Amino acid sequence: MQRNFRKTFVGKVVSDKMDKTITVIVDIYKKDPLYGKRVKQSKKFHVHDENQEAKPGDLVNFMETRPLSKTKRFRLFKILSHAKSAK
């Protein structure tokens, strides 16, 4: 299987407390079938971060990979933007 066919997602890092693992939340907007209103749904993913470079608040791009642990099936592909540090 080529890497080009793997699913990619964009999400926001909410936690980096685990070793080489970040938790990313992805927001998806779906249309309600009855009323037609757009409803926001969120899902959390555990993502492998080999170099531990992503921090909470960062916007990241991640992709599918082979199972790395019981809960990790994704790996960090690119950091799109860094979080603004609070001073």
Curated annotation (Swiss-Prot):
Transmembrane segments: none annotated. Keywords: Ribonucleoprotein, Ribosomal protein, RNA-binding, rRNA-binding. One of its GO terms (biological process) is translation. One of its GO terms (cellular component) is cytosolic small ribosomal subunit. GO terms for molecular function: rRNA binding; structural constituent of ribosome. NCBIfam families: PRK05610.1, uS17_bact. Belongs to the universal ribosomal protein uS17 family. Part of the 30S ribosomal subunit. One of the primary rRNA binding proteins, it binds specifically to the 5'-end of 16S ribosomal RNA. This is Small ribosomal subunit protein uS17.
